[in-house]
Amino acid sequence: MSASLRLSDLPQCFQGVVPSIIATADAAGIPNVTYLSQVYYVDERHVALSCQFFNKTRRNLDDNPRACVEIYDPMTLQSYRLRLKFLRSEKSGALFDAMSARIDAIASVTGMKGVFKLIAADVFEVQRLEKVEGFLAAGLPDAEADRPSLGGHRTEVRGLQWVSERINRAPDLESLLVAALEALEEYFQFAYTSVLLYDEQADRLITLASRGYGETGIGAEVAIGDGVIGTAARDRQVLRFSTLDADLGYARAIRRHASSEHTCEDIPRPGLTDAKSALVIPLTVGRRLVGVLAAEDRDPMRFSEWHEAYLQIVGNQIALGIDRMLDRSAADLDADAPPSTPRVSPPRSSRKKLTLTYYKNDEAIFVDGVYLIRNIPARILWKLLEESKRTGRTEFTNREVRLDTALGLPPVKDNFESRLILLRHRLQEKCPDLQIVSTGRGRFSLQTCADIEMIER
Protein backbone atom coordinates (compact mmCIF):
# COMPACT_ATOMS: atom_id res chain seq x y z
CA MET A 1 0.00 0.00 0.00
CA SER A 2 1.26 3.47 -0.80
CA ALA A 3 2.87 5.06 2.25
CA SER A 4 1.38 8.48 1.43
CA LEU A 5 -2.17 7.29 0.71
CA ARG A 6 -4.47 5.72 3.29
CA LEU A 7 -7.99 4.29 3.10
CA SER A 8 -9.08 6.70 5.83
CA ASP A 9 -8.20 9.57 3.46
CA LEU A 10 -10.98 8.44 1.10
CA PRO A 11 -14.23 8.27 3.13
CA GLN A 12 -16.27 9.76 0.28
CA CYS A 13 -15.25 6.84 -1.97
CA PHE A 14 -17.10 4.41 0.31
CA GLN A 15 -20.46 6.18 0.16
CA GLY A 16 -21.50 4.41 -3.04
CA VAL A 17 -22.42 7.52 -5.02
CA VAL A 18 -20.37 6.22 -7.96
CA PRO A 19 -20.64 2.40 -8.24
CA SER A 20 -17.41 0.51 -7.63
CA ILE A 21 -16.08 -2.20 -9.96
CA ILE A 22 -14.48 -5.52 -9.04
CA ALA A 23 -12.33 -7.73 -11.28
CA THR A 24 -11.65 -11.38 -10.44
CA ALA A 25 -10.32 -14.39 -12.32
CA ASP A 26 -11.04 -18.10 -12.15
CA ALA A 27 -8.45 -20.87 -11.79
CA ALA A 28 -7.76 -20.78 -15.53
CA GLY A 29 -7.14 -17.02 -15.45
CA ILE A 30 -10.33 -16.01 -17.27
CA PRO A 31 -11.36 -12.59 -15.91
CA ASN A 32 -14.77 -11.40 -14.76
CA VAL A 33 -15.68 -7.75 -14.17
CA THR A 34 -18.85 -6.55 -12.45
CA TYR A 35 -20.28 -3.77 -10.31
CA LEU A 36 -20.43 -3.95 -6.51
CA SER A 37 -23.34 -3.12 -4.24
CA GLN A 38 -21.18 -2.11 -1.27
CA VAL A 39 -17.52 -1.50 -0.49
CA TYR A 40 -17.32 -1.10 3.29
CA TYR A 41 -14.36 0.47 5.09
CA VAL A 42 -13.28 -1.76 8.00
CA ASP A 43 -9.88 -0.32 8.94
CA GLU A 44 -6.66 0.89 7.28
CA ARG A 45 -5.81 -2.61 6.10
CA HIS A 46 -9.20 -4.16 5.39
CA VAL A 47 -12.42 -3.64 3.44
CA ALA A 48 -15.56 -5.74 3.19
CA LEU A 49 -17.57 -6.40 0.04
CA SER A 50 -21.23 -7.34 0.00
CA CYS A 51 -22.03 -10.86 -1.19
CA GLN A 52 -25.70 -11.02 -2.20
CA PHE A 53 -25.73 -13.78 -4.79
CA PHE A 54 -23.78 -16.96 -5.43
CA ASN A 55 -22.50 -15.62 -8.75
CA LYS A 56 -19.39 -15.77 -10.90
CA THR A 57 -17.47 -13.40 -8.61
CA ARG A 58 -18.17 -15.64 -5.65
CA ARG A 59 -17.02 -18.75 -7.52
CA ASN A 60 -13.86 -17.02 -8.75
CA LEU A 61 -12.89 -16.00 -5.23
CA ASP A 62 -13.25 -19.59 -4.08
CA ASP A 63 -10.75 -20.59 -6.81
CA ASN A 64 -8.49 -17.54 -6.68
CA PRO A 65 -8.50 -15.17 -3.65
CA ARG A 66 -7.01 -12.19 -5.54
CA ALA A 67 -9.23 -9.32 -6.67
CA CYS A 68 -8.93 -5.76 -7.89
CA VAL A 69 -11.49 -3.09 -7.00
CA GLU A 70 -11.79 0.44 -8.33
CA ILE A 71 -13.45 3.08 -6.17
CA TYR A 72 -14.28 6.67 -7.12
CA ASP A 73 -14.39 10.02 -5.37
CA PRO A 74 -17.83 11.42 -6.27
CA MET A 75 -16.63 15.01 -5.82
CA THR A 76 -13.55 14.84 -8.07
CA LEU A 77 -14.30 11.61 -10.01
CA GLN A 78 -10.74 10.53 -9.25
CA SER A 79 -10.27 6.76 -9.39
CA TYR A 80 -8.37 4.63 -6.86
CA ARG A 81 -7.40 0.99 -7.26
CA LEU A 82 -7.38 -1.55 -4.43
CA ARG A 83 -5.41 -4.79 -4.81
CA LEU A 84 -7.14 -7.25 -2.51
CA LYS A 85 -6.73 -10.71 -1.03
CA PHE A 86 -9.84 -12.54 0.13
CA LEU A 87 -9.64 -13.58 3.81
CA ARG A 88 -13.03 -14.80 5.02
CA SER A 89 -16.81 -14.52 4.81
CA GLU A 90 -18.77 -13.31 7.84
CA LYS A 91 -22.44 -14.28 8.12
CA SER A 92 -23.10 -12.79 11.56
CA GLY A 93 -21.65 -10.24 13.93
CA ALA A 94 -21.33 -6.45 14.02
CA LEU A 95 -19.84 -6.08 10.53
CA PHE A 96 -22.47 -8.28 8.91
CA ASP A 97 -25.29 -6.52 10.78
CA ALA A 98 -24.10 -3.06 9.72
CA MET A 99 -23.87 -4.02 6.04
CA SER A 100 -27.07 -6.06 6.10
CA ALA A 101 -29.15 -3.25 7.64
CA ARG A 102 -28.35 -0.97 4.71
CA ILE A 103 -29.40 -3.58 2.14
CA ASP A 104 -32.49 -4.58 4.14
CA ALA A 105 -33.65 -0.96 4.23
CA ILE A 106 -33.46 -0.60 0.46
CA ALA A 107 -35.14 -3.98 -0.03
CA SER A 108 -38.00 -2.98 2.26
CA VAL A 109 -38.70 0.27 0.43
CA THR A 110 -38.49 -1.24 -3.05
CA GLY A 111 -40.57 -4.34 -2.26
CA MET A 112 -37.63 -6.75 -2.50
CA LYS A 113 -37.69 -8.21 1.03
CA GLY A 114 -36.33 -11.73 1.06
CA VAL A 115 -34.83 -11.35 -2.42
CA PHE A 116 -32.45 -8.42 -2.13
CA LYS A 117 -30.49 -9.43 0.96
CA LEU A 118 -26.96 -9.90 2.23
CA ILE A 119 -25.64 -13.45 2.20
CA ALA A 120 -22.23 -12.65 3.64
CA ALA A 121 -19.76 -9.85 4.28
CA ASP A 122 -16.58 -10.82 2.42
CA VAL A 123 -13.52 -9.43 4.22
CA PHE A 124 -10.40 -8.63 2.21
CA GLU A 125 -6.88 -7.56 3.07
CA VAL A 126 -5.87 -4.43 1.17
CA GLN A 127 -2.41 -5.28 -0.13
CA ARG A 128 -2.03 -2.17 -2.23
CA LEU A 129 -3.83 1.14 -2.66
CA GLU A 130 -2.95 3.39 -5.57
CA LYS A 131 -4.26 6.48 -7.27
CA VAL A 132 -5.02 5.89 -10.94
CA GLU A 133 -2.85 8.53 -12.58
CA GLY A 134 -4.14 10.20 -15.72
CA PHE A 135 -7.68 9.06 -15.01
CA LEU A 136 -8.87 12.67 -15.25
CA ALA A 137 -7.79 15.49 -17.51
CA ALA A 138 -5.55 18.07 -15.85
CA GLY A 139 -6.95 21.37 -14.68
CA LEU A 140 -10.17 20.24 -13.00
CA PRO A 141 -11.08 22.32 -9.92
CA ASP A 142 -10.12 20.98 -6.51
CA ALA A 143 -13.40 19.86 -4.98
CA GLU A 144 -11.77 19.29 -1.59
CA ALA A 145 -10.83 22.96 -1.42
CA ASP A 146 -14.44 23.94 -2.10
CA ARG A 147 -15.87 21.89 0.77
CA PRO A 148 -17.05 24.03 3.66
CA SER A 149 -15.00 23.98 6.85
CA LEU A 150 -16.75 23.58 10.18
CA GLY A 151 -14.11 25.49 12.08
CA GLY A 152 -12.11 22.78 13.84
CA HIS A 153 -12.44 21.04 17.19
CA ARG A 154 -13.32 24.15 19.21
CA THR A 155 -16.30 24.88 16.97
CA GLU A 156 -17.40 21.23 17.11
CA VAL A 157 -17.31 21.12 20.91
CA ARG A 158 -19.04 24.49 21.20
CA GLY A 159 -21.76 23.32 18.83
CA LEU A 160 -22.29 20.11 20.77
CA GLN A 161 -22.50 22.08 24.00
CA TRP A 162 -25.08 24.40 22.47
CA VAL A 163 -27.28 21.59 21.15
CA SER A 164 -27.00 19.74 24.46
CA GLU A 165 -28.05 22.81 26.45
CA ARG A 166 -31.10 23.37 24.24
CA ILE A 167 -32.20 19.80 24.86
CA ASN A 168 -31.42 19.86 28.59
CA ARG A 169 -33.33 23.09 29.26
CA ALA A 170 -36.55 21.98 27.57
CA PRO A 171 -39.43 22.07 30.09
CA ASP A 172 -41.49 19.33 28.45
CA LEU A 173 -41.34 16.66 25.77
CA GLU A 174 -42.75 18.77 22.94
CA SER A 175 -40.34 21.62 23.69
CA LEU A 176 -37.45 19.16 23.78
CA LEU A 177 -38.22 17.79 20.32
CA VAL A 178 -38.76 21.23 18.80
CA ALA A 179 -35.56 22.58 20.38
CA ALA A 180 -33.52 19.61 19.16
CA LEU A 181 -34.63 19.97 15.54
CA GLU A 182 -34.21 23.75 15.63
CA ALA A 183 -30.67 23.35 16.95
CA LEU A 184 -29.80 20.82 14.25
CA GLU A 185 -30.88 23.27 11.58
CA GLU A 186 -29.20 26.30 13.15
CA TYR A 187 -25.85 24.61 13.77
CA PHE A 188 -25.65 21.79 11.21
CA GLN A 189 -27.93 23.35 8.58
CA PHE A 190 -30.00 20.15 8.55
CA ALA A 191 -33.14 21.55 6.93
CA TYR A 192 -35.25 18.35 6.78
CA THR A 193 -35.49 16.39 10.02
CA SER A 194 -38.04 14.43 12.01
CA VAL A 195 -38.30 12.55 15.30
CA LEU A 196 -40.41 9.44 15.68
CA LEU A 197 -41.16 7.91 19.09
CA TYR A 198 -41.52 4.18 19.65
CA ASP A 199 -44.92 2.92 20.77
CA GLU A 200 -44.08 -0.41 22.34
CA GLN A 201 -47.72 -1.45 22.64
CA ALA A 202 -48.35 -1.03 18.90
CA ASP A 203 -44.76 -1.91 17.94
CA ARG A 204 -44.66 1.11 15.67
CA LEU A 205 -42.88 4.44 15.38
CA ILE A 206 -45.06 7.56 15.57
CA THR A 207 -43.95 10.89 14.09
CA LEU A 208 -44.12 13.52 16.84
CA ALA A 209 -41.98 16.36 15.46
CA SER A 210 -40.60 17.46 12.11
CA ARG A 211 -38.84 20.46 10.58
CA GLY A 212 -38.73 21.60 6.98
CA TYR A 213 -41.90 19.82 5.82
CA GLY A 214 -44.61 22.24 6.91
CA GLU A 215 -47.29 21.39 9.45
CA THR A 216 -48.50 18.04 8.11
CA GLY A 217 -47.31 14.56 8.96
CA ILE A 218 -47.57 14.51 12.75
CA GLY A 219 -48.98 11.12 13.70
CA ALA A 220 -47.59 9.31 10.67
CA GLU A 221 -46.63 5.74 11.56
CA VAL A 222 -43.75 3.50 10.50
CA ALA A 223 -43.76 -0.22 11.29
CA ILE A 224 -40.63 -1.64 12.86
CA GLY A 225 -38.53 -3.13 10.06
CA ASP A 226 -40.32 -1.14 7.34
CA GLY A 227 -38.16 1.02 5.09
CA VAL A 228 -35.02 2.91 6.04
CA ILE A 229 -36.42 4.26 9.33
CA GLY A 230 -38.05 1.02 10.44
CA THR A 231 -34.92 -0.99 9.62
CA ALA A 232 -32.68 1.36 11.61
CA ALA A 233 -35.06 0.99 14.57
CA ARG A 234 -35.29 -2.79 14.33
CA ASP A 235 -31.55 -3.36 14.06
CA ARG A 236 -30.50 -0.47 16.35
CA GLN A 237 -28.15 0.50 13.50
CA VAL A 238 -27.25 3.92 12.17
CA LEU A 239 -28.01 4.09 8.43
CA ARG A 240 -26.38 6.63 6.13
CA PHE A 241 -27.23 6.78 2.43
CA SER A 242 -25.76 8.90 -0.33
CA THR A 243 -27.55 7.11 -3.17
CA LEU A 244 -31.26 7.39 -2.48
CA ASP A 245 -32.36 7.12 -6.08
CA ALA A 246 -35.69 7.46 -7.84
CA ASP A 247 -36.86 4.07 -6.53
CA LEU A 248 -36.80 5.33 -2.94
CA GLY A 249 -38.46 8.61 -3.86
CA TYR A 250 -41.14 6.80 -5.83
CA ALA A 251 -41.76 4.28 -3.06
CA ARG A 252 -42.07 7.01 -0.47
CA ALA A 253 -44.57 8.92 -2.60
CA ILE A 254 -46.95 5.96 -2.92
CA ARG A 255 -49.74 6.04 -0.36
CA ARG A 256 -52.43 3.53 0.36
CA HIS A 257 -55.79 5.09 -0.42
CA ALA A 258 -58.90 4.54 1.63
CA SER A 259 -61.09 1.81 0.16
CA SER A 260 -64.27 3.09 1.81
CA GLU A 261 -65.59 6.21 3.47
CA HIS A 262 -64.71 5.12 7.00
CA THR A 263 -61.34 3.46 6.47
CA CYS A 264 -58.46 4.76 8.59
CA GLU A 265 -56.05 5.96 5.94
CA ASP A 266 -52.34 6.30 6.63
CA ILE A 267 -51.06 9.76 7.50
CA PRO A 268 -48.27 10.50 4.98
CA ARG A 269 -44.91 10.64 6.73
CA PRO A 270 -42.95 13.89 6.31
CA GLY A 271 -40.35 13.31 3.60
CA LEU A 272 -38.77 14.59 0.41
CA THR A 273 -39.89 12.68 -2.67
CA ASP A 274 -36.60 13.61 -4.35
CA ALA A 275 -34.21 12.96 -1.44
CA LYS A 276 -30.72 11.91 -2.50
CA SER A 277 -29.20 11.33 0.94
CA ALA A 278 -30.41 10.26 4.36
CA LEU A 279 -29.04 9.76 7.85
CA VAL A 280 -31.13 7.77 10.34
CA ILE A 281 -30.12 7.47 14.01
CA PRO A 282 -31.92 5.03 16.34
CA LEU A 283 -32.59 6.66 19.71
CA THR A 284 -31.82 4.14 22.44
CA VAL A 285 -31.26 4.02 26.18
CA GLY A 286 -29.04 1.00 26.60
CA ARG A 287 -30.57 -1.41 24.08
CA ARG A 288 -34.11 -0.16 24.71
CA LEU A 289 -35.55 1.67 21.71
CA VAL A 290 -36.97 5.13 22.44
CA GLY A 291 -37.39 6.43 18.91
CA VAL A 292 -35.61 7.47 15.72
CA LEU A 293 -34.01 10.71 14.52
CA ALA A 294 -34.08 11.07 10.72
CA ALA A 295 -32.46 13.64 8.43
CA GLU A 296 -32.49 13.82 4.64
CA ASP A 297 -31.39 16.15 1.87
CA ARG A 298 -31.42 16.65 -1.89
CA ASP A 299 -27.61 16.81 -1.93
CA PRO A 300 -26.20 13.26 -2.31
CA MET A 301 -23.04 14.26 -0.38
CA ARG A 302 -24.82 16.07 2.46
CA PHE A 303 -23.98 13.61 5.23
CA SER A 304 -20.41 12.55 5.98
CA GLU A 305 -18.80 10.21 8.51
CA TRP A 306 -18.30 13.28 10.69
CA HIS A 307 -22.04 14.03 10.65
CA GLU A 308 -22.83 10.40 11.45
CA ALA A 309 -20.54 10.31 14.50
CA TYR A 310 -21.62 13.74 15.71
CA LEU A 311 -25.32 13.07 15.25
CA GLN A 312 -25.03 9.86 17.25
CA ILE A 313 -23.85 11.94 20.21
CA VAL A 314 -26.76 14.34 19.72
CA GLY A 315 -29.09 11.36 19.34
CA ASN A 316 -27.94 9.98 22.69
CA GLN A 317 -28.76 13.34 24.28
CA ILE A 318 -32.22 13.35 22.70
CA ALA A 319 -32.89 9.74 23.76
CA LEU A 320 -31.93 10.43 27.38
CA GLY A 321 -34.01 13.61 27.33
CA ILE A 322 -37.07 11.79 26.00
CA ASP A 323 -36.64 9.04 28.59
CA ARG A 324 -36.29 11.63 31.36
CA MET A 325 -39.43 13.44 30.22
CA LEU A 326 -41.47 10.25 30.09
CA ASP A 327 -40.29 9.25 33.57
CA ARG A 328 -41.04 12.70 34.95
CA SER A 329 -44.50 12.85 33.41
CA ALA A 330 -45.32 9.54 35.09
CA ALA A 331 -44.12 10.67 38.53
CA ASP A 332 -44.89 14.40 38.66
CA LEU A 333 -48.36 14.94 37.26
CA ASP A 334 -50.25 17.40 39.42
CA ALA A 335 -47.77 20.16 40.27
CA ASP A 336 -49.45 23.47 40.98
CA ALA A 337 -49.50 25.87 38.07
CA PRO A 338 -51.38 29.09 37.33
CA PRO A 339 -54.49 28.39 35.28
CA SER A 340 -54.57 29.53 31.70
CA THR A 341 -57.02 32.16 30.50
CA PRO A 342 -60.16 30.30 29.40
CA ARG A 343 -61.26 30.59 25.80
CA VAL A 344 -64.33 32.73 25.32
CA SER A 345 -67.02 30.80 23.45
CA PRO A 346 -69.07 32.60 20.81
CA PRO A 347 -72.85 32.89 21.19
CA ARG A 348 -74.68 29.60 20.70
CA SER A 349 -76.40 30.81 17.55
CA SER A 350 -73.08 31.38 15.77
CA ARG A 351 -71.35 28.19 16.89
CA LYS A 352 -70.35 25.60 14.33
CA LYS A 353 -71.66 22.08 14.52
CA LEU A 354 -69.27 19.11 14.44
CA THR A 355 -70.10 15.43 14.24
CA LEU A 356 -67.52 13.16 15.85
CA THR A 357 -67.97 9.46 15.18
CA TYR A 358 -66.11 6.81 17.15
CA TYR A 359 -65.77 3.38 15.49
CA LYS A 360 -65.14 0.96 18.34
CA ASN A 361 -63.87 -1.93 16.23
CA ASP A 362 -61.27 0.28 14.56
CA GLU A 363 -60.71 2.43 17.65
CA ALA A 364 -60.84 5.45 15.34
CA ILE A 365 -62.50 8.87 15.42
CA PHE A 366 -63.77 10.75 12.37
CA VAL A 367 -64.75 14.44 12.27
CA ASP A 368 -67.56 15.11 9.82
CA GLY A 369 -66.55 11.95 7.96
CA VAL A 370 -62.83 12.79 7.84
CA TYR A 371 -60.34 10.58 9.66
CA LEU A 372 -58.85 12.22 12.76
CA ILE A 373 -57.03 9.72 14.96
CA ARG A 374 -57.02 6.12 16.19
CA ASN A 375 -55.87 3.74 18.91
CA ILE A 376 -55.03 5.07 22.40
CA PRO A 377 -55.16 8.79 21.49
CA ALA A 378 -58.65 8.19 20.08
CA ARG A 379 -59.71 6.49 23.31
CA ILE A 380 -58.32 9.40 25.32
CA LEU A 381 -60.23 11.98 23.28
CA TRP A 382 -63.48 10.02 23.46
CA LYS A 383 -63.15 9.68 27.24
CA LEU A 384 -62.63 13.45 27.57
CA LEU A 385 -65.60 14.23 25.35
CA GLU A 386 -67.86 11.81 27.25
CA GLU A 387 -66.79 13.20 30.62
CA SER A 388 -67.26 16.78 29.45
CA LYS A 389 -70.70 15.99 28.06
CA ARG A 390 -71.75 14.15 31.23
CA THR A 391 -70.45 16.59 33.85
CA GLY A 392 -69.67 19.80 31.98
CA ARG A 393 -66.01 19.58 33.00
CA THR A 394 -63.33 20.99 30.74
CA GLU A 395 -60.30 20.80 33.08
CA PHE A 396 -58.42 17.51 33.51
CA THR A 397 -55.19 16.14 34.94
CA ASN A 398 -52.83 13.62 33.42
CA ARG A 399 -53.12 11.46 36.52
CA GLU A 400 -56.86 10.90 36.38
CA VAL A 401 -56.78 10.05 32.69
CA ARG A 402 -53.89 7.63 33.15
CA LEU A 403 -55.65 5.85 35.99
CA ASP A 404 -58.61 5.01 33.77
CA THR A 405 -58.03 1.31 33.07
CA ALA A 406 -60.49 1.38 30.16
CA LEU A 407 -57.90 3.26 28.09
CA GLY A 408 -55.57 0.26 28.11
CA LEU A 409 -52.41 2.22 28.87
CA PRO A 410 -49.40 0.06 29.77
CA PRO A 411 -48.53 0.21 33.50
CA VAL A 412 -44.92 1.29 32.87
CA LYS A 413 -43.58 3.80 30.31
CA ASP A 414 -47.06 4.53 28.98
CA ASN A 415 -45.88 7.43 26.74
CA PHE A 416 -48.93 9.38 27.84
CA GLU A 417 -47.35 12.77 27.17
CA SER A 418 -46.35 11.76 23.64
CA ARG A 419 -49.89 10.52 22.95
CA LEU A 420 -51.28 13.84 24.18
CA ILE A 421 -48.86 15.74 21.91
CA LEU A 422 -50.01 13.65 18.96
CA LEU A 423 -53.67 14.23 19.79
CA ARG A 424 -53.15 17.98 20.19
CA HIS A 425 -51.37 18.28 16.82
CA ARG A 426 -54.01 16.23 15.00
CA LEU A 427 -56.77 18.42 16.43
CA GLN A 428 -54.92 21.57 15.38
CA GLU A 429 -54.55 20.22 11.86
CA LYS A 430 -57.92 18.54 11.31
CA CYS A 431 -60.31 20.01 13.89
CA PRO A 432 -59.22 23.50 15.02
CA ASP A 433 -62.60 24.13 16.69
CA LEU A 434 -61.73 21.50 19.31
CA GLN A 435 -58.44 21.91 21.15
CA ILE A 436 -56.47 20.44 24.04
CA VAL A 437 -54.62 23.25 25.83
CA SER A 438 -51.96 22.82 28.51
CA THR A 439 -52.80 24.69 31.73
CA GLY A 440 -49.71 23.71 33.72
CA ARG A 441 -47.59 20.68 34.46
CA GLY A 442 -49.81 17.63 34.38
CA ARG A 443 -52.93 19.67 33.62
CA PHE A 444 -54.87 20.49 30.47
CA SER A 445 -58.26 21.70 29.32
CA LEU A 446 -60.62 20.65 26.55
CA GLN A 447 -61.71 23.79 24.70
CA THR A 448 -64.27 24.03 21.93
CA CYS A 449 -66.06 26.76 20.01
CA ALA A 450 -68.48 24.35 18.32
CA ASP A 451 -71.48 22.23 19.24
CA ILE A 452 -70.40 18.60 19.13
CA GLU A 453 -72.60 15.66 18.24
CA MET A 454 -71.08 12.36 19.41
CA ILE A 455 -71.93 9.11 17.62
CA GLU A 456 -70.55 5.72 18.65
CA ARG A 457 -70.68 2.77 16.27
Q: Where are the model-predicted features located?
A:
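Helix-loop-beta substructure at the N-terminus of cytosolic sensory domains
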Residues: 170-208, 325
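Regulatory loop-to-helix N-cap segments in sensory/regulatory domains
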Residues: 216, 273, 290, 296-313, ...
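A short, aliphatic-rich beta-strand micro-motif
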Residues: 266-268, 276-284
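Signal-transmission linkers at sensory-effector interfaces
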Residues: 138-174
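A short linear beta-strand->loop->alpha-helix hinge motif most characteristic
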Residues: 339-363, 368, 432-457
